[in-house]
Amino acid sequence: MIILKSPHEIECIRKASKLTADTLSLLVKMAKPGITTLELDTIAEEYIRSHGGIPSCKGYYGFPATICASINEEVVHGIPSAKRKLKNGDVLSIDLVSSIDGYHGDSAVTIPIGHVKPDVMKLLKVTEESLFKGIEQVKVGNRIGAIGHAVQTYCEKHGYGVVRDFVGHGLGREMHEDPQIPNYGSLDQGPLMKPGMVLCIEPMITLGTHRVRVLGDDWTAVTVDGKPAAHFEHTVVVTENGPEILTMREEPRLIK
């Protein structure tokens, strides 16, 4: 069931989303060669808690950390570790959810670490651009499928794989609510968008095949061909005037 949010609820989600965005901005600055993903996780948790929030992912179905930290061929749900030290040329996807007063804000970025190969940088750029292509389709009267259609069309035009196994979602008091928001499909699929819907749009795009598998930790999803992946996400509310991005950072685009 899709829950339309009241103006008060949207304000609550806005507060959580700003905290998520601010935390991600801090992590982008801290993610350099030599730092471990566990150190980044500690920074994120301390920042969220010191600003009155709760790290939503920690303990969610047993997930042990504040951030999902996925490196290179890892698509989503990588577990931070003291043994995972970032290296020059890596790409690091950080997916982060924080909550304030029972409402969540969800966002993700993929960060180039040091000097990254041009073909991988292009993957990051196109993936981030595809997120905004999807957000452009957030209009009253459009169907949810218009979002995925825009993402898929743009990314496949560049020869990239569009992950099918993980999708975007609604958000509110629960971290994952209806509707599901695939990054593929046709314009006429899915429910109609209505004012008050809060959507997490999150393209997960690969340099090779779209197929993924989950590692033995039961969390980390990787590309089956070992090629790099990118992941960007925003929390967006549907309004009569179009989309409003609630998790926008001060620097709107990470990849220039």
Where are each of the predicted segments found?
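Active-site neighborhoods and metal-handling regions in enzymes and metal-associated proteins
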Residues: M1-K256
